[in-house]
Amino acid sequence: MRTLAIDIETYSSVSLQKCGVYAYAQSPDFEILLFGYAWDDGPVEVIDLARGESLPEELQNALYDPEILKTAFNASFERTCLSAFMGRVTPPEQWSCTAVMARELGLPGSLEAVGEVIGLPEDKQKSKTGRALIRYFSIPCKPTKTNGNRTRNLPEHDPDRWAI
């Protein structure tokens, strides 16, 4: 069986922490910004949906193929968001959650902490820079004179940051 590892970055004006993943993904302004994936143990590829790229048909089909195991850290989030994005439920029995696996082994609950505990090299761990970028582009911002009174940071507002 092939494995498709998935990591998405998203935006919604609804607070994930306050309202949960279903309300977050059902918000009218919800979108998937980046779709990162790797087949089996292959290299990671990233699709920049925020910049107009689209999911290849192979990936769209893979999301529903029972012969392909989909994995993610906190798979419920990826599955729910992808279901909203695709307009069709992705079958939960086709997913494996690496966060659950980590907890079963007595490891911490955050991806960052798991990477540290198992001794992943820094370039393979969730980076603090990456976390700051996710917050910048994925969470609504307060309107200020400096930012032109916008409530959201888009890639075109800071192309250099987006390129990281």
Segments from the language model and where they lie:
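Entry/capping segment at the start of metal-dependent catalytic domains
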Residues: 1-30
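Active-site-proximal helix-loop-helix substrate-binding element of RNase H-like nuclease domains
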Residues: 30-32, 36-37, 41-164
